[in-house]
């Protein structure tokens, strides 16, 4: 609509009907990460997630293991993951501070910018195993740098190209996800699907809507509720069996 409207107004300017095109100043709203009916199946169940993480472990690449582990066990966005610096991770308190993200600028170059919304800036907790995997990767990263001769930066990102120490290209995770799934004939989802997966499993494990919204940094409760509705629909199918087991003598 904006494109066609702008074309008409451009013509009006050319014909000197109006002085300027007001559509030039109209900003399109950012797309929201709602879960639609078309991608309800684009996530992993608890068992599928376990199976996928095992396939990642079989790659014998601690960097990939760390990256997919963090995605699966925190629900952070791909850009937030790839923008992480070691200083953002508090290994004493097992927390990660999300305060930036990677994006493409108008010149198609990878840049660091503030997260997509105010609520996206947040501290999230991580479990001991995730923390230990990250510690292992941190040591391994330094070993790779030392072997190649790469200098460590003052604000060292957690995940970079080991040779150039530059940020990974934005499609890095999707490319490896696709490769691993194809190699093992395994169900393929998109990287953003790990966010839906984490959200769904949080609800299934008993966390409240507010807790999940805060952890995932959803600015719009509608996004959280769309996944919650999907999970409760699944749980409703099991209500009879669960109640029967509860009442069993």
Where are these regions (language model features)?
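Short, contiguous acidic/charged loop-to-helix segments that flank catalytic cores in large enzymes
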Residues: 36-41, 57-59, 111-121, 160-169, ...
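C-terminal flanking helix
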Residues: 6-9, 13, 232, 236
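Active-site/catalytic core of tyrosine-dependent DNA strand-transfer enzymes
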Residues: 45-50, 127-186
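Basic, Lys/Arg- and aromatic-enriched nucleic-acid-binding interface segment
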Residues: 1-3, 14, 18, 23-84, ...
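C-terminal secondary-structure termini that scaffold catalytic or DNA-interacting sites
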Residues: 93, 106-121, 125-132, 136, ...
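C-terminal catalytic core of tyrosine-transesterase DNA break-rejoin enzymes
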Residues: 14, 69, 73-80, 171-183, ...
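Catalytic-site neighborhood detector that most strongly recognizes the C-terminal catalytic loop/helix
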Residues: 35, 102-104, 216-241
